[in-house]
From Swiss-Prot:
The protein's name: Photosystem I reaction center subunit IX
Topology versus the membrane: Single-pass membrane protein
GO biological process, one term: photosynthesis
Subunit structure: The cyanobacterial PSI reaction center is composed of one copy each of PsaA,B,C,D,E,F,I,J,K,L,M and X, and forms dimeric and tetrameric complexes.
Described purpose of this protein according to its UniProt entry: May help in the organization of the PsaE and PsaF subunits.
Family affiliation: Belongs to the PsaJ family.
Compartments where located: Cellular thylakoid membrane
Protein backbone atom coordinates (compact mmCIF):
# COMPACT_ATOMS: atom_id res chain seq x y z
CA UNK A 1 0.00 0.00 0.00
CA UNK A 2 1.35 3.44 -0.92
CA UNK A 3 2.12 5.89 1.84
CA UNK A 4 0.56 9.34 2.25
CA UNK A 5 3.41 11.18 0.48
CA UNK A 6 2.98 9.10 -2.67
CA UNK A 7 -0.80 9.57 -2.64
CA UNK A 8 -0.57 13.36 -2.32
CA UNK A 9 2.12 13.41 -5.01
CA UNK A 10 -0.15 11.49 -7.37
CA UNK A 11 -3.09 13.79 -6.55
CA UNK A 12 -1.05 16.93 -7.28
CA UNK A 13 0.24 15.39 -10.51
CA UNK A 14 -3.33 14.50 -11.58
CA UNK A 15 -4.79 17.92 -10.76
CA UNK A 16 -1.98 19.70 -12.62
CA UNK A 17 -2.59 17.84 -15.88
CA UNK A 18 -3.92 19.94 -18.76
CA UNK A 19 -7.47 18.53 -19.14
CA UNK A 20 -8.18 18.71 -15.42
CA UNK A 21 -6.73 22.21 -15.10
CA UNK A 22 -8.69 23.39 -18.17
CA UNK A 23 -11.94 21.93 -16.82
CA UNK A 24 -11.48 23.62 -13.44
CA UNK A 25 -10.51 26.92 -15.10
CA UNK A 26 -13.50 26.92 -17.48
CA UNK A 27 -15.90 25.95 -14.68
CA UNK A 28 -14.70 28.85 -12.53
CA UNK A 29 -14.87 31.27 -15.48
CA UNK A 30 -18.41 30.14 -16.35
CA UNK A 31 -19.47 30.52 -12.72
CA UNK A 32 -18.11 34.06 -12.57
CA UNK A 33 -19.89 35.02 -15.80
CA UNK A 34 -23.16 33.43 -14.68
CA UNK A 35 -23.10 35.21 -11.33
CA UNK A 36 -22.14 38.54 -12.95
CA UNK A 37 -25.01 38.15 -15.41
CA UNK A 38 -27.40 37.29 -12.58
CA UNK A 39 -26.59 40.43 -10.57
CA UNK A 40 -26.09 42.80 -13.54
CA UNK A 41 -28.12 41.35 -16.45
CA UNK A 42 -27.79 44.39 -18.73
CA UNK A 43 -24.05 44.97 -18.34
CA UNK A 44 -22.64 41.76 -19.81
CA UNK A 45 -23.46 42.57 -23.45
CA UNK A 46 -23.56 46.16 -24.65
CA UNK A 47 -25.70 46.94 -27.70
CA UNK A 48 -24.11 48.80 -30.56
CA UNK A 49 -24.75 52.58 -30.43
Amino acid sequence: MADKADQSSYLIKFISTAPVAATIWLTITAGILIEFNRFFPDLLFHPLP
